């Protein structure tokens, strides 16, 4: 591509709206332009980079035996209603009506569509396994779009769905996708780590996320410093401390006027917050759920929602619901005598002795409460882990980092096939539901994450495999016919080798051309200037020192970079 013919407009200043490196650099390099909140146009340079990521994904998916197709982005409500998710998905779904008042949505995800296709097209176990995928634009009405394409309302996603006849088949399909994802992110030059995750609105049993560490990430990721344990904070657990061994003491109600919070109660009673248990009340599908965790812990609402079999988001109980359940003011609720439809007790509480809780009476708490003797409930893990706790696998130290999700794989099982009556004829001649898996990659988010991990003060530093262009050939003075002639010859030679090259033949100062090449992140630069009188040009990697080389050798130097990166020229 000759830059004199290219639609490109780089920015020297950082746009005020941009908060993170990828957003700043995608705007400054001319990759994207904002259309509306969370909605972007992909300019030629941005689209070319996006297609590079898509091509890698497509190659690895095809290699893993998946078949590409393209589903409709507009989905009739009936499909979502058949799975029970039309109401459960929530406000993020863009819902529309046609002229006949029929309900549709712009697909935020495509489980129902793929399941419906399998239901109609796959009749026998002899046709299984099948893995279908698409690369398509998705739509989600994010409450707060931010960070450019990292969290936008319109984004490109690769979603794949496997259909198997049994659990063993699903395990094989899941493992194939895991291996494909590892290859995809490695080829993209992205340092992504697979972590245990919650299935969220997608549902199903097992799931894992591919996360990239990022200071601006929206998820907390828990890692063990000693072993390979890693999990999203929504899923992470810690090794349970040994049970306290104390002689049980009779309960005692004590006056705690104006002491509502854990810190206030602990100070008033001169005890550690670790000797208290706090109460949180939730409304889950119209039922009141009481959750009890140690006073210094934070409730994990995802774990609570899963334990409560919530159909959607859960919310804190209203003041009226709180009063009906406890009969007291805020800050004085406790487990003894509470009126709740479901009582969830964190397993850590079960191991505590003689702790303090609210008395369900305003101005009072109860000392020396013990689980089993004084109250009971459903024991489980309902809290967030904290930095420094013991790893559940090896006992090592847990550490927490911020991260961004770029991929997610699920074992759906029969969640959708049973709900939508999607069945096949099994080997025994009877109908059976498909055993499904779901595998997603955020393509636009992956591209932005690559930029987050590969940049410097001068701009993007694209890995060679995903760079929109491999080489920038710069004619320093376009009024010098010999410079233009040699630059054009090198440009054509590189193209004939399969190298994607830019010829900067613009009538601009050399400094402008160099800065544009750097901010765009082009991995290699060949500068054709005054040294051509000696048969030489300058060769420079995006990060590296400039070398003066013979004109006849420079194309082989470019090829050598492909060899170093184990990349084939097309």
Swiss-Prot record:
Query: From what superkingdom does this record's organism come?
Result: Bacteria
Question: Where is this protein localized, as stated in its record?
Answer: Cytoplasm
Q: What class of enzyme is it?
A: ligase
Task: Provide the reaction this enzyme catalyses.
Answer: tRNA(Pro) + L-proline + ATP = L-prolyl-tRNA(Pro) + AMP + diphosphate
Keyword Mitochondrion attached: no
- NCBIfam families according to UniProt: PRK09194.1, proS_fam_II
Protein known as: Proline--tRNA ligase
Source organism per UniProt: Clostridium botulinum (strain Eklund 17B / Type B)
